[in-house]
């Protein structure tokens, strides 16, 4: 457990709740004290959905501490079963309630006898794993539970579909542009003649999980969630998977070729033919995606050699690093991730594409690195956006955790060919470019001497003495800039070159007159 005012990945129970609330007709019960139950508020605020968050908090209070939790937890499970009639109820403790060392599995077993829903306890060590690892583990646990159940009941049909099909695994609630990415992946697979078998967990039903083995292969767009499930399905049912994230032209090509390889394993026998996607890749790269020609344009060449820092989850940070270095000629001074559990893979991916690698979940270390490097732009999470504002460095957000502005209503995927256009726009708009650079250097803004920047003065003919600077600093930040501009404007109009406290008050009086 760690006390911090900013965490890149939250506690384990948040990951479990994200997976549970992504499925349709699944209810989660969180065994937690007040304070750990913020998930409902967070999801309701951020996700653009009309449905209520299907999570109930079974609060650990003084009565529970005195008598134990069994009665309360079992009552909550039975009540929710009666009210909501869910297919599955997932019970999860939090790292705080885990301190009580109660046998929650026993509570689940007892409740299961009296309810119609399936009930499982999230099999997660809340002290050892973070939000993303817990989400990955919970998804695998739910998939395993329902496939084992179907096998026991003799309902498991392992015959594959007549036409090429895929499962998309790892799209879930509160993910970074996940809904948009999912639409783009569906479009990509449709173009390749591949049917969607299942998308899990987002929008899926647990009763349909028994159909997962019917697909020809599994597509895992994000390493953080879905990989454990794919490995389990490969081991148990021999299902191949593709885990190359189709983000950026080069990786989209690699992903499509990997899909072609997986599909041709079966088409050779079932359809007596082999599929070739090279023409599709060529058409999309040259004529559909704007990013390929944009990266060769004079606009993009202005970015060549500019420094950038990239930080985020392993999937997005590694892909973004390769896009900047390979496709846009931007120098990535530092690439980093907060996914310490996936450090080895991340280092392998970005090796040779950046000057240094940073593996940390400490935001102060990231801030210090950015301040030391002084890049032209940052590509990171919401925290890097805050750091950028403090250091006056533009920041493009490319990874969770994010705030409301990165849950857009419009269509903004980061994956697939449309995703390449979005990324090109984001990169280009994040840098201060061309003539803008010169104007800022010469005038501190546009071509007028009347513009005042954040520094104390843009002109050498105006100087603030120590008393006036001290007085200015006493003024609250949200109006300080306005007062400074008004004072300097008054000084220029009256031919004053040295600003004193008296000048400040004279400017105030003149403005109020």
UniProtKB/Swiss-Prot annotation:
The keyword Transmembrane does not apply. Binds 1 [4Fe-4S] cluster per heterodimer. The cluster is bound at the heterodimer interface by residues from both subunits. One of its GO terms (molecular function) is oxidoreductase activity, acting on the CH-CH group of donors, iron-sulfur protein as acceptor. Its cofactor is [4Fe-4S] cluster. Substrate binds at residues 434-435. [4Fe-4S] cluster binds at residue 36. InterPro entries: ChlB/BchB/BchZ (IPR050152), LI-POR_suB-like_C (IPR013580), Nase/OxRdtase_comp1 (IPR000510), P-CP_red_C (IPR042298), Protochl_reductB (IPR005969), Protochlorophyllide_Rdtase (IPR016209). Its EC number is 1.3.7.7. One of its GO terms (cellular component) is chloroplast. Pathway: Porphyrin-containing compound metabolism; chlorophyll biosynthesis (light-independent). It comes from the Eukaryota. One of its GO terms (biological process) is photosynthesis, dark reaction. It is an enzyme of class 1 (oxidoreductase). It holds the Pfam family Oxidored_nitro. The active site is at 299 (proton donor). SUPFAM superfamilies: Helical backbone' metal receptor. It is found in: Plastid, Chloroplast. It catalyses: chlorophyllide a + oxidized 2[4Fe-4S]-[ferredoxin] + 2 ADP + 2 phosphate = protochlorophyllide a + reduced 2[4Fe-4S]-[ferredoxin] + 2 ATP + 2 H2O. Keywords: 4Fe-4S, ATP-binding, Chlorophyll biosynthesis, Chloroplast, Iron, Iron-sulfur, Metal-binding, Nucleotide-binding, Oxidoreductase, Photosynthesis, Plastid. The keyword ATP-binding applies. Component of the dark-operative protochlorophyllide reductase (DPOR) that uses Mg-ATP and reduced ferredoxin to reduce ring D of protochlorophyllide (Pchlide) to form chlorophyllide a (Chlide). This reaction is light-independent. The NB-protein (ChlN-ChlB) is the catalytic component of the complex. Belongs to the ChlB/BchB/BchZ family. Protochlorophyllide reductase is composed of three subunits; ChlL, ChlN and ChlB. Forms a heterotetramer of two ChlB and two ChlN subunits. This is Light-independent protochlorophyllide reductase subunit B. It comes from Anthoceros angustus. The gene is chlB.
């Amino acid at each position: 457990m760690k006390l911090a005012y900013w965490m890149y990945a939250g506690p384990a129970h948040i990951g479990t709740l994200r997976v549970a609330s992504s499925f349709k007709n699944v209810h989660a019960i969180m065994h937690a004290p007040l304070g750990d139950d913020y998930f409902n508020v967070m999801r309701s605020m951020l996700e653009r959905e009309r449905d209520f968050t299907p999570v109930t908090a079974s609060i650990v209070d003084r009565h529970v501490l005195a008598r134990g939790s069994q009665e309360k937890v079992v009552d909550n499970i039975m009540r929710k079963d009666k009210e909501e009639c869910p297919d599955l109820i997932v019970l999860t403790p939090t790292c705080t309630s885990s301190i009580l060392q109660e046998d929650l599995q026993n509570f689940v077993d007892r409740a299961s006898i009296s309810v119609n829903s399936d009930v499982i306890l999230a099999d997660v060590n809340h002290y050892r794993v973070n939000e993303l690892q817990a989400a990955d583990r919970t998804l695998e646990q739910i998939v395993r539970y329902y496939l084992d159940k179907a096998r026991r009941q003799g309902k498991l049909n392992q015959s594959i579909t007549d036409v090429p099909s895929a499962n998309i695994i790892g799209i879930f609630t509160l993910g970074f542009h996940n809904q948009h990415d999912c639409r783009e992946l569906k479009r990509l697979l449709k173009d390749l003649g591949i049917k969607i078998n299942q998308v899990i967990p987002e929008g899926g039903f647990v009763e349909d999980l028994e159909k997962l083995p019917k697909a020809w292969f599994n597509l895992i767009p994000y390493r953080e969630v879905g990989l454990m499930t794919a490995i389990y399905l490969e081991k148990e049912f021999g299902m191949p998977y593709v885990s190359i994230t189709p983000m950026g032209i080069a990786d989209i090509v690699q992903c499509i070729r990997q899909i072609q390889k997986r599909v041709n394993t079966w088409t050779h026998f079932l359809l007596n033919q082999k599929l070739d996607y090279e023409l599709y890749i060529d058409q999309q790269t040259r004529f559909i995606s704007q990013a390929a020609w944009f990266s060769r344009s004079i606009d993009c060449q202005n970015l060549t050699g500019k420094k950038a820092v990239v930080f985020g989850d392993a999937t997005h940070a590694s892909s973004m690093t390769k896009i900047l270095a390979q496709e846009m000629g931007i120098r990535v001074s530092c690439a980093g991730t907060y996914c310490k559990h996936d450090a080895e893979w991340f280092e392998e991916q970005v090796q040779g594409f950046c000057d240094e690698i940073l593996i940390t979940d400490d935001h102060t270390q990231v801030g210090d690195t950015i301040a030391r490097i002084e890049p032209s732009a940052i590509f990171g999470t919401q925290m890097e956006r805050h750091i950028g504002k403090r250091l006056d460095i533009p920041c493009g957000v490319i990874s969770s955790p994010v705030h409301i502005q990165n849950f857009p209503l419009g269509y903004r995927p980061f994956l697939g060919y449309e995703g390449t256009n979005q990324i090109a726009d984001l990169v280009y708009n994040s840098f201060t470019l061309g003539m803008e650079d010169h104007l800022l250097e010469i005038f501190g803004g546009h071509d007028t001497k009347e513009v005042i920047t954040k520094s104390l003065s843009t002109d050498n003919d105006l100087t603030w003495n120590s008393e006036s600077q001290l007085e200015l600093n006493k003024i609250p930040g949200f109006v300080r800039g306005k007062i400074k501009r008004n004072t300097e404007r008054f000084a220029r109009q009256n031919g004053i070159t040295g600003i004193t406290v008296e000048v400040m008050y004279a400017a105030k009086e003149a403005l109020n007159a």
